[in-house]
Amino acid sequence: MMCLTPSQFLERRACFMSVMMHTAQHQTCIDACNACLQACEHCLTACLNEPDVQARVRCIQLLRDCADICSLASQFMSRDSSYAKQICNVCATICDACAAECGKFKDEHCQKCANLCKKCADECRKMAA
């Protein structure tokens, strides 16, 4: 076990508290990214089981991209990365594209996913501003 001097302890505590404060500020966006990620994964699985799966190829591709970028954005914000804003800008762009594509399909899973993608894009734009 490593012992810290009082000044080292205070320095590390201040650093930890700073990260926690930044994470709390980004929590709404992190939550939106996580909800979008989950919706994309669910929608992807459902689309693969639809009878018109061939018509959904672009949607499926975007769902994969959207789920991945939402996960990455959530991770970058959680660790207070200096690149979080750039990742969130990309996330907003991909979420917008995914929302537009999912919106073309009338089934419940695509409509729900489109709505959550729009919310995520909005939160990511706010975070990146």
How does the language model describe each region?
Residues M2-A129:
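Amphipathic alpha-helical hairpins
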